Amino acid sequence: MTSAFDLTGRLAIVTGARRGIGFAMAEALAQAGADIIGVSATLEASGSAIEQAVTSHGRRFEAIACDFADVDAIAALGERLAVRPVDILVNNAGTIERAPAAEHPIELWDRVIQVNLSSQFVLSQAVGRSMLERGHGKIIFTASMLSFQGGVNVPGYTAAKSGVAGLTKALANEWAGRGVNVNAIAPGYIATDNTQALQDDPARSRAILDRIPAGRWGVGADLGGATVFLASAASDYVSGIVLPVDGGWLGR
């Protein structure tokens, strides 16, 4: 009997696939049988670590380099991907800029909103149209703990990730009845480049660990199961959720 989690023959786009959470998501999808189109701001045409990881599982990998802060580049990427028979879109690319709200430059605000929210809507719209025409598809956003909480010194990031949670629900309301499931994963405190400043701050890191019932920072592989679930037939009746993968952070 075929597993409901089997992704053999599926084509998945994963943005921000070069490292961190996106790398782990792409590899998990490949392990489940999907071929991968990896998109990142800087991604080698061949020979990248993520290509090696995907092909080690016997799956095909295609690399696309795209600057998510560039409005024109994102529009062109959407047009390029819209003609592909994409089954799964993982909107994971993101950035973070830290500064107190009273001093936060508008240029940084605009960049974070563009990369973390606007570009993801453009890609979802372009790829989503094709999915709607075919009557099936899975779209997964990477949300955040700051889709639920306010954070400190990251006003643009919090606004963007709150927007991602809202966009997930908005698209799900329109598309669930047409065969396209739209959901989000909200990682907790995961040990990646984006959280390096927190990991390097002994007091802040200790405070974070004290609140996580699991007692540790998450790692990219912790997102794999949730990603495969939301990308597979196992989640066909799941739409509009923001699924925390946080070691219990929000339950504390």
Task: Name each model-derived stretch.
Residues 11, 18-19:
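Conserved glycine-rich cofactor-binding loop
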Residues 34-49:
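Conserved glycine-rich Rossmann-like NAD(P)H-binding loop of the short-chain dehydrogenase/reductase
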Residues 100-101, 108-113, 208:
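Substrate-binding pocket helix/loop in short-chain dehydrogenase/reductase
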Residues 121, 178, 216-250:
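C-terminal substrate-recognition "lid" of short-chain dehydrogenase/reductases
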Residues 124, 160, 168:
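Active-site helix of classical SDR
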Residues 129, 173-177, 236:
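Alpha-helical segment proximal to the catalytic Tyr-Lys
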Residues 144:
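Residue(s) in the substrate-gating loop at a strand-loop-helix junction
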